[in-house]
A protein has these predicted regions:
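Accessory alpha-helical/coil subdomains and C-terminal extensions
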Residues: 1-75, 81
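Phosphate-binding loop/pocket of nucleotide- and phosphate-handling active sites
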Residues: 116-153
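Conserved catalytic/coupling modules of large nucleotide/cofactor-utilizing molecular machines
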Residues: 92, 100, 104, 108-120, ...
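Catalytic, metal-anchored helix/loop core of enzyme active sites in primary metabolism
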Residues: 67, 74, 84-99, 106-110
Length: 153
């Protein structure tokens, strides 16, 4: 999934989809042999799938899938979502946020302000200088990482 420098999207995808492994740049503790061992152990317990969410900053999913297939002898597929992950139908929340952020941006322009980015932070809509916004990174929560690991067992 997208996430060259940040694993926020990967972590949320992993939690939402019950992934067994989430690989993110912020907490890179990647041990390929451990993953292979877990896949084999899960298969022996009757589990028929093992989902790994890989943030793009970690490396190539396709080559990882090939190495896992070679090590386990099990059919393995890599799915590169790319821009497809942006293409879902908007939720009610998406539509409300888009309308509110669009109105906020128009208000800024009417006030003579430009080079601003509108976002949602800490429960409210805010605007930021464009250069400041480009330097921001949405961090991941250590607790969410723990939950993802606990849920994958």
């Amino acid at each position: 999934v997208m996430g060259r420098d940040a694993g926020y999207i990967a972590l949320w995808c992993g939690l939402a989809n019950g992934a067994e492994q989430v690989l993110i740049p912020e907490k890179y503790d990647f041990d390929e042999q451990k993953i292979v061992n877990n896949i084999i152990a899960n298969r022996k317990r009757g589990k028929r799938h093992y989902i790994i969410i890989n943030a793009e900053g970690i490396g190539h999913s396709t080559s990882l899938a090939r190495r896992i297939e070679a090590a386990t002898g099990m059919e393995t597929r890599a799915t590169i979502l790319g821009h497809m992950q942006r293409g879902g139908s908007p939720t009610c929340k998406d539509r409300v946020y888009a309308s509110t952020m669009g109105a906020y941006a128009v208000d800024l322009l009417c006030e003579g302000k430009s080079n601003r980015v509108v976002g949602f932070s800490h429960g409210e809509f805010k605007d930021f200088d464009i250069n400041e916004a480009l330097g921001m990174n949405k961090g991941v929560s250590d607790y969410m990482i723990k939950v993802a690991k606990d849920m994958s067992k």
